[in-house]
Amino acid sequence: MEELKAKSEIRSLRKKEHIDNFLQGKFQSDNYFQYIYLEHNALPEIDFYEIDTKLNFLGKTISFPLMINAMTGGFQRAVEINKNLAKIAGNFNIPMAVGSQAIAVADKDYEASFKVVREVLKEGLVISNINGFATVDQVARAIDMIEAYGVQIHLNPAQEICMTEGDRNFKGVLKNIENIVRKIEKPVIVKEVGFGISQTVAKRLLEVGVKYIDIGGRGGTNFIEIESWRNEHFHFEELFQWGIPTALSLLQCRAISRDLKIICSGGMKRAGT
């Protein structure tokens, strides 16, 4: 029990440091959307006032093809952060994903910052989040914790390598994802955390039954910079540009299959990002 508490406290501190370090981060990478041009249609043949932005996502109708993606949870200040984010999601009727729930799955004392999202959103579309090493039971518990409509399985090898306490062995993750997809009844979304998903990886995921990919491309939150602030021994400035830019990752993944459902995230700051 003492060992579990110690691990939970380390995780909680790390999550707090992630927010603090993000806020003091200075590095800006680009997501390549500046190289994307939408073709102008001079003959749209539509009535602007008939445009309907609603769509069905994970079995629920949402008002816009937008979502508040996974950010945080697992420390005291995260309760207020997630509460405010959930209010925004509710006001616009868009989905919200929570940050990694691994800490709360292991220790119920840390559930509050995740459960607050469901408390605020009530019937809204909430998505769970946990790592690629999670067991089927852990995934199920993460979903049940917030009555989620689906679950994100996040992939973050670049971040882990830059963490002093991070994982170094990534063997078996694909097989584990395949097992989760087969045994979990809710939709499973495989998500990168800011370094993009390549065409090759998208193809491998599709082959094991993954239907939803969140590309999480380069251009937004930079976890190499965030972890660099935390690492007392090494600074990773030469790797701050690491990753597949969001726009490029989107094109690569879409080329795999028109049936693959893609969430495009990574530096989406404004319209025409």
What are these regions (language model features)?
Residues 110-128, 170-189, 234-262:
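Alpha-helix-loop-beta-strand connector modules within alpha/beta enzyme cores
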Residues 56-60, 84-91, 114-122, 140-147, ...:
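Acidic (Asp/Glu)-rich catalytic clusters
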Residues 135-145, 195-212, 251-258, 262-264, ...:
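Catalytic cores of alpha/beta
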Residues 56-103:
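Active-site cofactor/substrate anionic-group-binding motifs, chiefly glycine-
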Residues 44, 66-69, 94-98, 125-130, ...:
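Hydrophobic faces of well-ordered beta-strands that scaffold small-molecule active sites
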Residues 148-173, 201-253:
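Glycine/Thr-rich beta-alpha phosphate-binding loop at enzyme active sites
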